[in-house]
């Protein structure tokens, strides 16, 4: 029986152990998509408690606690003490067996704090105090955590109207780890509520210093902000969309739709889809002009619980996997850009695992030989960011594409304790490849190639692909 969370955790063969310990584990981390708060990095924030860094904003844990019968005040309540919240999480952890949270929890305790104990009600106070004692020291600050995990680059997620002041402050401080912005223009496509859209466009007008009175003005303002992001080192965009949009439209129609929505009128469903379709193309062309990589996270049904949405807002644990027949629209969107010669590097992330093989074959339609893996099948995202989800994504890509050209893992996280997800991914990758070598499905004579493949997927592919 193997020791839980031992040095060979998830590594079931000697070859897997060699691949991980001698190669994958030695690679720095490039976290090319995350949701860290830039101000925390700029200010080198010192966390007040393990509850703040671990449970604050972690909707994965909140979902588990609610499922375990824990009252909401222990998840998101403002009048509940840090210890009370941690205690309720410790009571929940034993019930997360076979849930990835059990692995994440103990891997984070081990790698960040050197704690090998199992978290449960009996060990809760001891672990709480030990973590808090360490968090009070400078090496456990926001920057200290990034250094601890050998992070080389992080890309945050930023709105076009963000000032990026904290990226600038961090860079000018001489911090050795790069923190770069990512362009996330979701709100400029959110035309369902006229008042919200108009309020956003007014903010865009203010920060861009462009007087916006029509659609062309809005695009001018967006281009100005796009240029500004590029000046601050941005190399990626990201789009959170329910599905792909590829309706037929004319320029005149889009200008008329803008005038209608900006004037405060509700749009028809058809008009909403046309506007979103046009914006995806325009934004994709902007990214192509600068050589950026565009990312698409699609397939979530968000804010399902309307009562809790009113109480807590978005991103609080009430989202789920959607069912969208999106293959044709995705193909049409990519083809429109490709037909113009304006399809930039692209990463597609699906939330429904039923789409794995669809995406793995879709990316092959638009590889053009300009660079290896120009169109990528993104790593398992959100609910798929776990062992089974990772393996299914890796297997689909292996069978239908080129795994060796994959740009690898990202945290997609708001937490400075989430970097062990890279380790978890690397162990999973090495286990798959090691098993194939030992079963004779990959020749042992190609071991040097397999070793390089592991290092490439862990680090070098991303470094070269994004030109960090």
Language model features with spans:
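Metal-cofactor-binding active-site regions of metalloenzymes
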Residues: 1-290, 342-344, 348-353, 357-360, ...
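Divalent-cation-assisted or electrostatically stabilized phosphate/pyrophosphate-binding catalytic cores
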Residues: 324-330
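Short, basic/hydrophobic alpha-helical segments
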Residues: 333-339
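A short acidic, glycine-rich active-site loop
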Residues: 268-269, 318-324
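Short glycine/proline- and charge-enriched loop/turn segments
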Residues: 309-317
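C-terminal amphipathic alpha-helical interaction region
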Residues: 294-296
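Hard-cation-handling environments
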Residues: 300, 305
């Amino acid at each position: 029986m193997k020791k839980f969370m031992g040095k060979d955790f998830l590594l079931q063969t000697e070859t897997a152990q060699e691949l991980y310990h001698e190669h994958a584990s030695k690679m720095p981390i490039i976290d090319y998509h995350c949701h860290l708060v830039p101000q925390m990095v700029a200010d080198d924030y010192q966390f007040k408690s393990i509850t703040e860094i671990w449970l604050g904003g972690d909707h994965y844990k909140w979902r588990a606690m609610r499922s375990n019968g824990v009252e909401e005040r222990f998840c998101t309540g403002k009048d509940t003490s840090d210890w009370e919240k941690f205690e309720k999480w410790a009571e929940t952890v034993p019930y997360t067996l076979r849930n990835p949270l059990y692995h994440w929890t103990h891997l984070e305790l081990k790698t960040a704090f050197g704690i090998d104990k199992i978290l449960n009600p009996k060990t809760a106070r001891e672990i709480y105090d030990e973590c808090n004692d360490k968090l009070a020291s400078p090496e456990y600050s926001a920057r200290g955590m990034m250094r601890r995990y050998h992070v080389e680059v992080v890309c945050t997620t930023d709105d076009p109207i963000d000032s990026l002041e904290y990226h600038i402050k961090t860079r000018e401080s001489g911090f050795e780890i790069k923190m770069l912005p990512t362009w996330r223009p979701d709100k400029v496509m959110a035309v369902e509520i006229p008042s919200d859209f108009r309020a956003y466009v007014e903010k865009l007008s203010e920060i861009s210093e462009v007087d916006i009175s029509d659609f062309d003005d809005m695009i001018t303002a967006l281009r100005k902000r796009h240029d500004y992001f590029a000046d601050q080192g941005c190399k990626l965009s990201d789009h959170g969309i329910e599905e792909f949009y590829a309706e037929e439209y004319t320029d005149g129609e889009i200008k008329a739709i803008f005038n209608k929505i900006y004037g405060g009128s509700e749009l028809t469903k058809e008009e909403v889809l046309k506007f979103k379709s046009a914006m995806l193309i325009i934004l994709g062309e902007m990214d192509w002009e600068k050589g950026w990589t565009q990312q698409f996270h699609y397939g979530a049904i968000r804010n399902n619980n309307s009562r809790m949405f009113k109480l807590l807002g978005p991103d609080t644990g009430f989202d789920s996997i959607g069912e969208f027949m999106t293959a044709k629209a995705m193909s049409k969107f990519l083809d429109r850009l490709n037909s113009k010669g304006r399809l930039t590097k692209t990463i597609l992330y699906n939330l429904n695992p039923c789409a794995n093989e669809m995406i793995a074959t879709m990316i092959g339609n638009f590889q053009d030989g300009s660079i290896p893996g120009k169109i990528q099948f993104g790593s398992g995202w959100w609910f798929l960011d776990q062992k089974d989800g990772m393996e299914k994504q890796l297997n689909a890509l292996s069978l239908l594409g080129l795994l060796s050209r994959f740009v690898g893992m990202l945290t997609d996280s708001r937490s400075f304790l989430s970097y062990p997800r890279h380790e978890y991914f690397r162990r999973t990758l090495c286990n798959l490849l090691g098993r194939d070598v030992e079963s004779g499905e990959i020749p042992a004579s190609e071991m040097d190639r397999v070793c390089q493949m592991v290092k490439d997927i862990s680090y070098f592919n991303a470094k070269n692909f994004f030109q960090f």
